[in-house]
Amino acid sequence: MRIGFCCKWLNDRSEFGGMKVNAKDRELNGRSTTMRWLREHPEDAEQRQWDIMNHNATAARRLIERVGTLPPERRMVRLGSEMLQGYTEAGWINWWQQKHIQDHLENLFAPVGEMARRLNVKISFHPGQFCVLSSESANIRHRSVEEFEYHVDMARWMGFGKSFQDGCKINVHISGRLGPQGIIDALPKLSPEARNLITIEND
């Protein structure tokens, strides 16, 4: 059994009040932007995306390296869902799927997984509340599969998902009106890697 933590490394009391990361720990924590900012600054948007993706993957590797110094029972960390901004958003999905970007992401994330395996740090993701695989809405189910597979892409680039529960888990709530049967019906729509990585949390 392991005890982990969620997304942010806060190591100083000055950071606890508003979960605000100080300069010392910034290199271990991710950055983000908003879809509104990207829409309103089209001339700078792509460069912002490059800067954030590079920072966030590097921060994840540094975070895992830091967690790897903890006692074995505490070597577990949940990585944030906002690693790649707007990965499934209509205005950005085609941009993210360009081959040169996908190739860059694979090269960027591979060292993250290598670090986790070398230091025996278990990784997890937890897609947000709008990822509802058992929703009664076909559109929401479709969007939820896209969102889940986004997390699978990150795990795949890190070298996970090749076998069942091989060092990374992606957790979702059952939620949704279709309940457990909805999850069962969704499984065939997921990639083989996704089925190896999924874990279910009962609401």
Give the predicted meaning of each segment.
Residues 126:
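Conserved, mostly hydrophobic/aromatic
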Residues 174-203:
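Acidic/histidine-rich catalytic cores of soluble enzymes
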Residues 1-121, 131-134, 139-144, 153, ...:
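Alpha/beta catalytic barrel-like cores
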Residues 135-148, 180-191:
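Short, electropositive alpha-helical surface patch
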